């Protein structure tokens, strides 16, 4: 490297530093996120209801108290505050509804039924459905978006 042009070494150093920071951040998130993520597998067996699924998550501070979105059918979507998993997949949002329950905001259409609950996870429909069925759950599995899949129980 030329003494008159220190730029190549500087760019290389900045790149290495950025790469190291990114790897450390990913490693810290990966290790702490996976190790400390709360599993919702047992609750997604479809033997519960919207209130019994969502209320403990609210009480523990695992999800935000106000829904980020309410569907016309009254299904409420709650953001997570802490890492959650379902059948080994990271939870993107928690879903829930229970008729006449103040936890849930009503939508502007016909409610989905008396209750519904579930999650949207990061994963393909095929992989998620295989894990759900292997665990013995009767939950409905539907693709929400590419690589986002809903796991839902309802009455």
Regions found by a protein language model. Name each.
Residues 129-155:
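C-terminal partner/receptor-binding element of secreted or periplasmic proteins
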Residues 25-34:
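C-terminal segment of classical bacterial N-terminal signal peptides
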Residues 5-21:
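Bacterial N-terminal signal peptides that target proteins for export
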Residues 79-135:
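Long, charged/polar, surface-exposed segments that mediate recognition or autoinhibition
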Residues 68-74, 108-114, 140-148:
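Short, ordered beta-strand-loop transition motifs
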């Amino acid at each position: 490297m030329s003494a008159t042009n220190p730029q190549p070494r500087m760019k290389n150093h900045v790149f290495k530093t950025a790469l190291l920071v990114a790897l450390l951040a990913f490693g810290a998130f990966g290790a702490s996120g996976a190790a400390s993520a709360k599993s919702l597998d047992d609750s997604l067996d479809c033997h519960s209801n919207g209130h019994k699924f969502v209320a403990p998550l609210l009480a523990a501070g695992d999800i935000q108290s106000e829904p980020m979105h309410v569907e016309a059918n009254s299904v409420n979507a709650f953001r997570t505050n802490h890492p959650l998993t379902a059948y080994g997949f990271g939870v993107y949002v928690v879903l829930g509804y229970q008729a006449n329950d103040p936890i849930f905001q009503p939508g502007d259409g016909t409610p989905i039924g008396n209750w519904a609950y579930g999650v949207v996870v990061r994963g393909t429909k095929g992989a998620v459905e295989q894990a759900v069925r292997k665990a013995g759950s009767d939950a409905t599995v539907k693709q929400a978006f590419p690589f986002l899949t809903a796991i839902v129980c309802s009455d």
